[in-house]
Amino acid sequence: MKKLFLVLAIAASLQAFDAQAQVKSPAAALSAVQKAEATTQNAKQAAKAATWVKYADALMDAYEAPKGNFWLGMSRQEIDMLGGGEKPSAEQAVDVAGRQMTKLVYSNKNLYLNENGQLEVIEVSAPLVDDVLTKAFDAYKKAAELDAKGQKTKDISEGLARAACAGEVNGE
């Protein structure tokens, strides 16, 4: 019976994992930012809203990439199983706002597990791009200025909402 529950739990975890947006590797995300940024330097391409939306989207992917395949609510077992081979360099008991949490230290991020062993905070300690959210916001703003016909309004609105939500989470 225990084996059946274990198999069902693993299947549910894998299904939840597939439901998550596929996160680019940090190297791929940084490469995409560099390529999109180079496109914005081309005068002909820089006059198109789509160029700026693509650049802003690449910046947002670069913002998310260091988080890896982790998501809020993961259990410690899921972190160990689905972490993509990443292992923490240190594990510490820390006090966060009066709450005892377990801090898992990685090369580019810190994961904070609550008292129930669930992932509650993902702190990126080594962002791929400096001031990435401001740059993404500015790129979406530039896209909106160039989108006279309103063809990219939906993409711009979704991107701005994504950037704003990320900024709220990080207190920016």
Tell me what each language-model feature is.
Residues 19, 42-43, 123, 158:
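A general structural-boundary detector
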Residues 1-29:
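Bacterial Sec-dependent N-terminal signal peptides
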Residues 20-67, 71:
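Start-of-domain marker
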Residues 19, 38-39, 119, 154:
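A near-ubiquitous, low-amplitude feature marking generic local secondary-structure context
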Residues 6, 38-41, 145:
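Generic surface-pattern signal
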Residues 58-172:
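Short coil/linker segments at helix-helix boundaries
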